[in-house]
């Protein structure tokens, strides 16, 4: 299963927390000390917790489950979309709309509207209506794509959510907890780890650190998916031998 190393985390700056005056005491057990008024995360604690989280995500993928990637702050958005697409998982990288999980029925209707508009744009409908109406529909489609494009193929509740910056995604965490959906999250020294099932203590601001979390998660998920193929091929091989 995909694993990260201490060297990778050091090079990515995972150990740099926030200014000491902003710390959350609940993160105290994961803090090694302070340097220049910046808390330093204890990577000896992060390493096994990060790898446990990766094993969990890979296990979900191995069972054909779904992991929803969530990271809506600007520094993470593009990377969230890139890595979620790489492992074929849904994502939210613009803004978390209240009810995305707890009111999924309504969200699915909005997704249907988005898909209808996509069809209209492709089948020439936009060319048959007035320019004003076509412009309105085009703007509506762009707005829906921004908010829902990453989850438009998500047909049911995810089996877990993977969050970059738990302090920025409190609504998503609360909705997941209300529905009993496990939460994997990067928790910096200024945030509250409560409500996160798989805590990854570390820097949630540095682009290199965010990239490491996301690429490692995508690798673990792809490996998990690969194990499905291997298992199926193994079963077929056994059946062929039995027939022979």
Curated annotation (Swiss-Prot):
Pfam families: Ribosomal_S2 (PF00318). One of its GO terms (cellular component) is cytosolic small ribosomal subunit. Keywords: Ribonucleoprotein, Ribosomal protein. GO terms for molecular function: structural constituent of ribosome. GO terms for biological process: translation. The keyword Nuclease does not apply. Signal peptide: none annotated. Belongs to the universal ribosomal protein uS2 family. This is Small ribosomal subunit protein uS2. It comes from Hydrogenovibrio crunogenus (strain DSM 25203 / XCL-2). The gene is rpsB.
């Amino acid at each position: 299963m995909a694993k990260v190393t201490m060297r990778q985390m050091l090079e990515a700056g995972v150990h740099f927390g926030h200014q000491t005056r902003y710390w959350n005491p609940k993160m105290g057990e994961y803090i090694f000390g302070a340097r220049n008024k910046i808390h330093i995360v204890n990577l000896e604690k992060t390493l096994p917790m990060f790898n446990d989280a990766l094993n969990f995500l890979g296990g979900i993928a191995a069972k054909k489950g779904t992991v929803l990637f969530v990271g809506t702050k600007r520094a993470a958005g593009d990377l969230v979309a890139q890595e979620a697409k790489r492992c074929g998982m849904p994502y939210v990288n613009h803004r978390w709309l209240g009810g995305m999980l707890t009111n999924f029925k309504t969200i699915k209707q909005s997704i249907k509207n988005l898909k209808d508009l996509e069809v209209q744009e492709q089948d020439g409908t936009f060319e048959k209506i007035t320019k004003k109406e076509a412009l309105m529909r085009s703007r509506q489609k762009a707005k829906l794509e921004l908010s829902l494009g990453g989850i438009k193929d998500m047909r049911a509740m995810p089996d877990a959510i993977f969050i970059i910056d738990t302090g920025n995604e409190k609504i998503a965490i609360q909705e997941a907890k209300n529905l009993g959906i496990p939460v994997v999250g990067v928790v910096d020294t200024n945030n509250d780890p409560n409500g996160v099932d798989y805590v990854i203590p570390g820097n949630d601001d540095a682009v290199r650190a965010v990239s490491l979390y996301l690429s490692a998660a995508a690798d673990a998920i792809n490996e998990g998916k690969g194990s499905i193929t291997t298992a199926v091929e193994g079963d077929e091989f056994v059946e062929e031998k039995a027939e022979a």
